[in-house]
Amino acid sequence: ISEPKQGMATSDNNRFLKFWHEVDFVNIGFNFLNTKDAYDSNLKWFPYNKGGEFRRWYGNQEYVVNWKNDGQEIKKFREYKNATLSSNMGVAGLSDIFKESITWSFVSSSNFGVRYSPNGFLFDVGGSSIFPDKKDIKYLTSFLCSNVTLVFLRIFSPTINFQAGDLKLLPIIFSQSDSNSIKQSIEILTQENIDISKEEWDSRETSWDFTKNELLKHLVPKGTL
């Protein structure tokens, strides 16, 4: 259906990663669809999936990565490290950056859950991702958020790490017919869950899509709660 991909390691997160609110907001490139448009924008920072705490459906969108000029600084730093320290660093998954995806946290103490990620993100080794066809992404998201998936992953990976290779082993029933009513019902429910999770995430001031405190939404006309 789709190949789980391990994300990149910058080799120096303190240098190349920032919380989105630590940088100039107008210098963040949101919603880019491909590397060419991102390069032509001359922007420096781009959304970055880095895993984070256990959360299903949507969220954990906190970081941006320095990907100006198609990651020029990161790539040069990698070359320097490889030459001076004989390290084997890599910038993986570049063919899929900025694509709509499903992402998850590499480390989790007890639970597993994936999150829908819209276009515009790069991704970390701690936030590995899957890039299915658009027509399958909601259905696959629901399966990966199910208890069935958790049971299988606890068998495949008894540790606290959920690697891309573990997800490759998951069995899934997948209809080839787009008119399948069960699949359509699942996709509708999945979208509802994503919408609910997004609304909750964006109600926090730590979200870059935050607009208004939840308490203010309940003010009566006279300005009291």
Which residue stretches match the model-derived regions?
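S-adenosyl-L-methionine
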Residues: 1-58, 62-225
